Structures are given as C-alpha cells and as structure tokens.
Amino acid sequence: MARRRSQRVCASGPSMLNSARGAPELLRGTATNAEVSAAAAGATGSEELPPGDRGCRNGGGRGPAATTSSTGVAVGAEHGEDSLSRKPDPEPGRMDHHQPGTGRYQVLLNEEDNSESSAIEQPPTSNPAPQIVQAASSAPALETDSSPPPYSSITVEVPTTSDTEVYGEFYPVPPPYSVATSLPTYDEAEKAKAAAMAAAAAETSQRIQEEECPPRDDFSDADQLRVGNDGIFMLAFFMAFIFNWLGFCLSFCITNTIAGRYGAICGFGLSLIKWILIVRFSDYFTGYFNGQYWLWWIFLVLGLLLFFRGFVNYLKVRNMSESMAAAHRTRYFFLL
C-alpha cells in the first residue's frame, strides 16, 4: 500500500508541475489549493519514507523522483503566485473579490483636494492597517485645515469713549423699565392734554398771523416807513402852509416819513383856515359870501380838524417810537 501511494505521488507530481507552469494566469485560489495538496502529499510520503524509500530505491530511483516532483510543485506554485501578482489590473478602481487579502488596494482621498486627486496605489504587504490609519489621519487633517479659527484668536474691537458719546448722541438711552411702564393718573393726563392743545393753538395762530402778514426781509431800514424827526415835520408844515394845496401835494408825496406826512396835513389845515379868514374879512368878496355864513363855518371846522389831527397824531407816534426803541425793524401804518 505504501509503495502504491508513493507511485501515485510520483506520477501526480510531474502533472501538477506542468499544470502549474502552463497556467500562470489562474486565480490565486487554484494555486493555493495545489500548494495545499502538494504539502499534504509530501507529508504523507514523509511519514512512510522508510519502506517507500527502499521501494523507490529498489524500483530505480522512484523516491528521488517523488521528492523532485514535490519540489517542482512548490516552485510552480511560487511562479504562479508571482505571475498573478505581476498581472496588470484592467480596472484599477475596481477590486476583485476573488483575490485574497494580499492583493492590491487603492486608497481614495478627499475629492476636493486637487493636488491629490490621482489614485495612489499601494504595494501588497502583509500589514495594510498602518497605511489605512495614515490615510484616515490625513483626511481629518485636510478637514481641520478648512475649519474656522478658534474664538480665542478673534480680536474684538472695544469701542472708545468717543464712539460711545457719538452713539449716545444719535441714539439716546431709553428710560428705565420702571419709568417706561408707569402710567400717569387721569388728572395728569388731562393737564398734559390741555397743555398740548394750548401749545398747538398758539402755534396755529402764530402761523396764520405769519401767513397773513409775512415779514418783508427785502426792505432795508432806509426803505421802511420811519417816524422821522421834528425838522421834517416843520419843513412839510411850512411847504403846505405857504403853497397851500400845491405845497401839500408835494410834501405829502415826496416825503416817506410819518413826520413829513403829518406835517403836510397840519400845514394844509392851517392854510385852509387862513384863506377862510382872508375871504371873510376882505372887501373883495363881500357880494359873494354875505348871505352864506354856514359855508364859511364848514371850511373853518375842516381846517381846524386837519391841523389838530396832524399835530396830535405826530406826537403820539413820536412817543410810541421812543417807548419801543428796543424793537427792531418796526413799521407804523396810520390812516389819514
């Protein structure tokens, strides 16, 4: 039985060697199975070596042939592994599920990193765990580079006193909560409402007065109607008194002061009284006014009224101007 097993091993050795050398593109699983079967056959042959060795030696060197065949099987398995390891991968990105743990791996890094976008091929090693750890540690490093800076590195600008003053000027500080939420009583609310209505009414009346009599800022003091002085009053008075109605028109139209106009009125009234007396006591007009005394009295009273009106109004205006000397740009209008 032992001789038959050794012959079977010797016969199967060359066939296994030829199959291992002739099929280098077989999968890793076939090479591994051949290696395992060769090891099992070698172990069986080594256990029964003493009787088999004698048989092989007696049979013309069958024992060395079996040893050579087992060695050839091991060499063929190694060549098969090398050929499989050197075979190019048609698809680098796809991993073959039939390959064992000693195959090739492709580590995919962060796609956002343009500098490391190409695939990195790692050689087959027995311990790929440190490389995976290194790749995993490089990925968080890239993520931490894009993270925001810590809060301690951010500098906060403290507003200065000038900025605070400017902010307080444009944005006043609101009152405290106790003051803002405290409601006034009914009497206080009514008083505040009455005061607001009075202020609004005063403002409305002042606005209406300004609209009705707008101030004329385009006039200067020389163009305004001023009071005048006593000299202008006497000049206009004598012009109207001497030249009668012609002097009255000239003095009233030329002068632009209250004194000149009231002086012209006063002089014209006195001139009218003068001519009434002349006509009454003259011998030239005895035939015209002897029976018409009422007409004389009418002109005499009219002259007296004009004289006293001009003189009295001028005195009132002068006294008023002296009492209101502090008022600036005041205008006086008096009707004749």
Swiss-Prot record:
Post-translation changes: Ubiquitinated by NEDD4 and ITCH. Also ubiquitinated by NEDD4L. Ubiquitination by NEDD4 or NEDD4L does not affect turnover.
Induction notes from the record: By T-cell activation.
Listed GO CC annotations: cytoplasm; endoplasmic reticulum; Golgi apparatus; Golgi membrane; intracellular membrane-bounded organelle; mitochondrion; multivesicular body membrane; perinuclear region of cytoplasm
Motif PPxY motif 2: positions: 174-177
Subcellular compartments: Endosome membrane; Golgi apparatus membrane; Endosome, Multivesicular body membrane
Subunit architecture: Forms heterodimers with NDFIP1. Interacts with HECT domain-containing E3 ubiquitin-protein ligases, including NEDD4. Interacts with NEDD4L. Interacts with PTEN. When phosphorylated at Tyr-167, interacts with SRC and LYN SH2 domain. May thus act as a scaffold that recruits SRC to NDFIP1, enhancing NDFIP1 phosphorylation. Interacts with SLC11A2/DMT1. May interact with phosphorylated EGFR. Interacts with KCNH2.
Record-listed Phosphotyrosine modification sites: Y151, Y167, Y171, Y177
Positions of the UniProt region annotated as Disordered: 1-24, 37-156
Protein's UniProt keywords contain Phosphoprotein: yes
Biased composition (Low complexity): 37-48
Residue intervals annotated with topology Cytoplasmic: 1-231, 279-287
GO biological process: metal ion transport; negative regulation of gene expression; negative regulation of protein transport; negative regulation of transporter activity; positive regulation of canonical NF-kappaB signal transduction; positive regulation of protein ubiquitination; ubiquitin-dependent protein catabolic process; vacuolar transport
Protein name: NEDD4 family-interacting protein 2
Stretch list, region Interaction with NEDD4: 148-151
UniProt note: domains: The PPxY motifs are required for E3 ubiquitin-protein ligase activation and for ubiquitination.
Entry comment describing in which tissues the protein is expressed: Expressed in brain, lung, heart, skeletal muscle, kidney, liver and placenta.
Principal place of residence: membrane
Pfam family, one: NEDD4_Bsd2
Compositional bias annotation for Basic and acidic residues: 78-99
Segments carrying motif PPxY motif 3: 184-186
Membrane topology: Multi-pass membrane protein
